[in-house]
A protein has these predicted regions:
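Short N-terminal helix-loop-first-beta-strand/juxtamembrane motif that initiates sensory/input modules
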Residues: 44-53
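Beta-lactam-recognizing serine transpeptidase/beta-lactamase-like catalytic domain environment
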Residues: 13-15, 55-103, 108-283
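Small/polar loops that bind or transfer phosphate-bearing groups
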Residues: 30, 51-52, 167
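Short coil/loop residues immediately preceding or within conserved phosphate-binding loops
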Residues: 25, 46, 90
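Structured loops at beta-to-helix junctions and adjacent beta-edge loops in soluble globular domains
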Residues: 1, 29-31, 218, 280
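Small/polar-residue-rich segments within soluble enzyme cores
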Residues: 1-23, 40
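Short, basic/aromatic recognition patches
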Residues: 32-43
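Bateman/CBS regulatory modules and CBS-like beta-alpha motifs in cytosolic regions of diverse proteins
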Residues: 20-34
Length: 283
């Protein structure tokens, strides 16, 4: 690589013989088996896969498709960057692609309701397949009626009508503050090139925007990497570890040059809140 810890005299000897000195070796946190499985599972779909180790922040797998062959990027450059090429293979969809979070955002809608209401377990709503406020209606998938549910059951069913009604119960300003704490509208704690996710809901936006946002639609945009970080924090008792992909650097003879250690970013939620969400996600 760009630097080497080969002994000085060895380097001089290599120079005199017209040979290149071996560089250091970088060992990543990527798990080959997981990386290969994620790559194959994504197939020909456009999308991304991110796998993290919650307790350390190690990035175990990261896939973005469509992809490209780095060995032939010079020859392929013109086709990769052509105006009529809609694949955007040079975009790392895992860290740079911004998408509506959809039902994954119900994690945060749930967390906000729990934080605002100590009696959250008592909330129930009878789903008839849709929820209407004024001229605006939110439908469940296939207009399915889920019946009477509590929060835990509605989370498991991913009931849009329930969550639209739940959203109307929230303090929008506090919801925005929660999303700020969850790193929306901010740089993620990573050295990777990553886009900022956005949460822009305001009280003045009205019921239609509030309902849509509560089910992960509306104007909210997020990267797959960001959502993986949030789920990782939930699985680590509310604590987010800084994600990293470099495990260590070794010299050409295998001597350890530098070891990268896990580092805590901060607490995103209480241990109790994380336990509730883990329970809901496993229901």
């Amino acid at each position: 690589l760009l630097r080497s810890n080969t002994a000085f005299l060895d380097k001089v000897g290599d120079e005199m013989q017209g040979e290149k000195s071996p560089g250091d070796n970088v060992v990543t946190t990527l798990d080959y088996g997981l990386q290969a499985t994620a790559y194959d599972a994504l197939g020909y779909y456009k999308g991304a896969v991110v796998v993290l180790e919650p307790a350390t922040g190690k990035i175990l797998a990261m896939v973005s498709k469509p992809d490209f062959d780095p060995n032939t990027i010079a020859e392929d450059w013109d086709s990769l960057t052509a105006d009529d090429n809609t694949d955007a293979a040079l975009l790392n969809r895992a860290t740079q692609g911004l998408y509506p979070p959809g039902s994954t955002f119900k994690i945060l809608t749930t967390l906000e309701y729990i934080q605002e209401h100590e009696d959250y377990e008592n909330y129930s709503y009878t789903c008839t397949g849709s929820y209407t406020v004024g001229n605006h209606t939110i439908h469940c998938y296939g207009n399915k009626s889920h019946g009477t549910q509590n929060l835990r059951q509605a989370f498991a069913n991913s009931c849009n009508a329930f969550y639209a009604s739940l959203g109307m119960e929230l303090d929008v300003d506090q919801f925005g503050q929660l999303c700020d704490r969850m790193l929306f509208n901010a740089s993620l704690p990573t050295d990777l090139q990553a886009s900022k996710s956005s949460f822009v809901l305001k009280k003045s936006d009205g019921s239609s925007a509030i309902m849509a946002t509560s089910i992960g639609q509306g104007q909210t945009l997020v990267t797959p990497f960001h959502m993986a970080l949030l789920v990782s924090a939930i699985n680590n008792d509310g604590v987010l570890m800084k994600p990293y992909v470099l495990d260590r650097v070794e010299s050409s003879d295998g001597t350890l040059v530098e070891q990268y250690e896990p580092e805590e970013y901060g607490t995103l939620m209480t241990t109790d809140e994380a336990e509730i969400l883990k329970d809901y996600m496993g229901y």
